[in-house]
Amino acid sequence: AALRAGSPRRLILAPGNYGLDYLHEKMPALKNIPVVKTSNFIGDTMDMAAASHFEEVVLVGHIGKLVKLAGGIMNTHSRTADCRTELLCAHAALCGASRDVCAALMNAATTDACMEILDEAEMREPVLSSLLDAIQLHLDRRAAGAFRVGAVLFSNQYGPLGQTRTAKELLDEWKNG
């Protein structure tokens, strides 16, 4: 269905098994869209999607991987660049977080722990909104006009966390035909 003549060429990218599992469990309406498991190579996979003339791409992944996109990091392996807590802290600071909240974020061991800290500070929504805007910016830069792209973030502990502006648009279009 995603590759039929006359329809936009659509693709879902999932950085790992968590993303694949989330797609099957929480987004069954998208089962006819081709899915590529990217591993840590999100930027390279986006480049291949452009070379293959896909027109619409949605990344679906765990916040622990996709938060790195907010910093323009397109190879998400922890040996290449980690900075999950640093990016969460930076966006929390932009949203008015206290020094104590920022310190707690910097010392958190996981992104789920960061979500707990943000919940306690009643800052999860604005911080995720800021992160999603930054992710959208970096995805658009990497796609360089070759295709529309967005991202869906989730946590195994907290479930759906949000989606970028373009992901929302694309998913609405995909569900409606």
Which residues make up each language-model segment?
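N-terminal loops that bind phosphate or other acidic moieties
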Residues: A1-E55, K65-L66, A70-G177
